[in-house]
Amino acid sequence: MKFIDEAKIEVAAGKGGNGATSFRREKFVPRGGPDGGDGGKGGSVWAEADENTNTLVEYRFVKRYQAKNGEKGHGSDRYGAGADDIVLKMPVGTLIRDLDTGETVADLTYHGQRVCLAKGGKGGLGNIHFKSSVNRAPKQSTPGEEGEARSLQLELKVLADVGLLGMPNAGKSTLITAVSAARPKIANYPFTTLHPNLGVVRIDENHSFVMADIPGLIEGAAEGAGLGHRFLKHLSRTGLLLHVVDLAPFDETVNPAEEALAIINELRKYDEELYGKPRWLVLNKLDMLDEEEAQTRTAAFLEAVGWDYPKPDDRFQFDMETPRLFQISALTHQGTQELVHQINQYLTEKKRIEAEKAEAEKAAANVEIIEQQPKTDTGVFKPE
């Protein structure tokens, strides 16, 4: 299936049914009172996050979604039937914006999340509601309300804990295959990966994380060159980036350091926030080099890119600040277990810190609410 991560659609809820104007007609009751029922509600349009839906391709072909109108009211105080709602299944990670206002309508972040995109109109009132002591035979009823209508922009940003970044053919797809059950297409030529691939990396029964592999970047990606620029947005929700570098390119004229610096430059030009995300360096394809050559190339590469970070100190607590360096072979799995182990440690510590921060903010908000409450004089003796 073709990977589609953007679409524009129109949604329109149904109109409420009109209320009925009707009077009782029974034998021996020549002047029966009003008995017009209310109209039914119009159908609404909902978006629902579905973990089994992976692309927005359906919304490229069907552009408009119109819910049905509610049924009009009937005599004998019978209400009109409400129209069925429409539920649009969308991938988890879909961001929905109103094209006219720019407002974010919904951010679908978990399976089963449901958001109303267009609310159906209320049914009109039948004339039974307008009976009074001065008007025993009202002919008044109200029409149903119009349903909401919107033009929407759908944008899919995959949800992953870790994102792989690098030039085409750096070995990102091989890495995600080595550490997860994902099976992306792998071949010895650039741009084998044409859309994001997700892989779940399982550490044990209780710990796992999601890794995203996007098409490789090339110089000029921020301006639209190559394929990767379309998918950089998918890295915006990740908590950690792995910059994968081919340390043993087949083309001897290729300079890994220059390519790595070009990637960093493209990242900065595309989005400062994305550039500022925690980023670890992964030197790949060590299986192509003997030990001495690997050490020589690694030292030359680190000097060329200005890597002068100390080795992280994890003796007392996992070091969250210092960028990390890994030397691996995704093909032979050399070094990959240590890599995923440290990623898991990082993500676990990150979640703990975020939970503590959220708890502290909640406590501070509660204190502020208490301080803002008006003080009363209850229980204070005030002699007259």
Swiss-Prot record:
Signal peptide range in chain numbering: none
Residue numbers binding Mg(2+): 173, 193
Q: Name one GO cellular component term.
A: cytoplasm
Which residue ranges does the record assign to the Obg domain? 1-159
Q: Where is the composition biased (Gly residues)?
A: 33-43
Record has DNA-binding as a keyword: no
Q: What is its EC number?
A: 3.6.5.-
What this chain does, per the entry, is described as: An essential GTPase which binds GTP, GDP and possibly (p)ppGpp with moderate affinity, with high nucleotide exchange rates and a fairly low GTP hydrolysis rate. Plays a role in control of the cell cycle, stress response, ribosome biogenesis and in those bacteria that undergo differentiation, in morphogenesis control.
Subunit info here reads: Monomer.
Protein name, UniProt field: GTPase Obg
Organism in which the protein naturally occurs: Neisseria meningitidis serogroup B (strain ATCC BAA-335 / MC58)
